[in-house]
From Swiss-Prot:
Binding residues annotated for glutathione, in chain numbering: S16, P17, N42, K43, K56, V57, E69, S70
Lineage of the species this protein comes from: Eukaryota, Viridiplantae, Streptophyta, Embryophyta, Tracheophyta
Gene: GSTU4
Protein name per Swiss-Prot or TrEMBL: Glutathione S-transferase U4
Residue positions where Phosphothreonine is found in the record: T151
Free-text function comment from the UniProt entry: May be involved in the conjugation of reduced glutathione to a wide number of exogenous and endogenous hydrophobic electrophiles and have a detoxification role against certain herbicides.
Annotated organism of origin: Arabidopsis thaliana
Length: 224
């Protein structure tokens, strides 16, 4: 389906993994889009108008239709633009991709980053709890080039935008090697494979800028 850039608009924030994964999906499918950078602190009238429920990015505007929440947007993109499928066709495999994506956003993010930043139980305890979660993903990607198999898919976009190109830079800023190669060889191999994909590289935020951004996030978490 040929689209013009003005038909597809994405409101996002440069350091947001939720925004990055949507951009990866657009690039994977070759969909032209207009990107509108948002200030997530001083939210624009446009953002508040089109996403009054969550008041956050990303937001997709397509031919007057508005969608928020990255998982919802990714599924919608996959249904509208059929080329280079993101989700598996098999119902069970599709359900499992959605399951693990939810696991990444709802379990890995809060435990592996927020808990470590707060360190209420001590940093070492928090790291141990986080690494127990990563072991599930280590097993899930074992023997595969990507979570999606030979090509990147839904879970690769979700986990890839969140773990190596967001959380890992936060851990780096805290001086923590959360996913050491000797303990997680499969995850590290997967990360290397991701970095070889052009559309992924195009969507990765600048490393040093993101590390500084994540340091500020850590300070906000600690002071909350």
């Amino acid at each position: 389906m040929a689209e013009k850039e003005e038909d597809v608009k994405l409101l996002g924030f440069w350091a947001s993994p939720f925004t990055r994964r949507v951009e990866m999906a657009f690039k994977l499918k070759g969909v032209p889009y207009e990107y509108l950078e948002q200030d997530i602190v001083n939210k624009s009238p446009l953002l508040l108008q089109i996403n009054p429920v969550y008041k956050k990015v990303p937001v997709l505007v397509y031919k007057g239709k508005i969608l928020s929440e990255s998982h919802v947007i990714l599924e919608y993109i996959d249904q509208i633009w059929k080329n280079n499928p993101i989700l598996p066709q098999d119902p069970y495999e599709k359900a499992m991709a959605l399951f693990w994506a939810k696991f990444v956003d709802e379990q890995v993010g809060p435990v592996a980053f927020m808990s470590v930043a707060k360190a209420e139980k001590g940093v070492e305890v928090a790291i141990k709890e986080a690494q127990e979660l990563f072991m599930f993903l280590e097993k899930e990607v074992t023997g595969k080039d990507f979570f999606g198999g030979k090509t990147i898919g839904f879970l690769d976009l979700v986990a890839g935008s969140m773990i190596p190109f967001c959380l890992a830079r936060g851990w780096e800023g805290m001086g923590i090697d959360m996913i050491p190669e000797e303990k997680f060889p499969e995850l590290n191999r997967w990360i290397k494979n991701l970095k070889e994909i052009e559309i992924v590289r195009e969507c990765i935020p600048p490393r040093e800028e993101q590390i500084e951004h994540m340091k500020k996030v850590v300070e906000r978490i600690k002071s909350a």
